[in-house]
């Protein structure tokens, strides 16, 4: 592959370890800086009340990310170390699904059902752009729910996953020629309602 995808394997692999320090990344998802607005956002109530609803909202997003990477792997658009790195990304998203599912159950809730998804996978550059959008959105989504989470344990887990999503996004942003320098001292959160609207085109049922 030519251009920005040549170093995909090296860049993605470097950002994949949970032992790495957290990285911030820019987002272009229409986010807001208002913590009050985030705390007032009740869009996750459709998934359940309180922390369970927030966890199920996050679980739904992780379902989408896991399905996306699975489809990319099947597409064979990437080869060699590039494909291996994408497989690693997908594996980490699948681990998030397991962790969130287990947490919902431990809190006495019912995990959200897995939606059927469909993603446009036309060529490698387009897939990288879509992956960057998905990962930036995921990172912003977790941060957006931080003010609403009541349990310290759930908050710690959510921020840990947010860190991984941010590193995924930073790697993809680099390959797309976007700056790796954050556009401010604080990462930008995203309201659940906006995030759900953004991913709706990928959900077919």
Q: What do the PLM-derived regions correspond to, one by one?
A:
Residues 4, 8-11, 17-205:
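All-alpha RGS (Regulator of G-protein Signaling) helical domain and cognate RGS-like helical scaffolds
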């Amino acid at each position: 592959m030519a251009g920005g995808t040549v170093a995909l394997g090296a860049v993605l692999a470097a950002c994949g370890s949970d032992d790495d320090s957290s990285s911030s990344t820019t987002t272009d998802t229409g986010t807001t800086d208002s913590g009050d607005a985030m705390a007032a956002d009740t869009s996750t109530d459709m998934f359940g009340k309180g922390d369970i609803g927030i966890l199920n909202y996050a679980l739904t997003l992780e379902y989408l990310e896991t399905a996306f990477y699975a489809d990319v792997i099947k597409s064979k658009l990437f080869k060699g170390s590039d494909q291996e790195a994408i497989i690693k990304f997908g594996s980490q998203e699948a681990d998030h699904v397991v962790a969130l599912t287990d947490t919902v159950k431990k809190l006495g809730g019912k995990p959200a059902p897995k939606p059927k998804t469909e993603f446009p996978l036309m060529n490698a550059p387009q897939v990288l752009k879509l992956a960057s959008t998905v990962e930036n959105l995921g990172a912003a989504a977790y941060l957006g729910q931080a003010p609403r989470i009541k349990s310290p344990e759930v908050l710690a887990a959510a921020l840990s996953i947010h860190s991984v999503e941010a590193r995924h996004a930073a790697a993809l942003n680099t390959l797309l020629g976007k700056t790796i320098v954050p556009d401010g001292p604080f990462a930008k959160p995203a309201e659940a309602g906006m995030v759900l609207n953004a991913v709706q085109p990928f959900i077919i049922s």
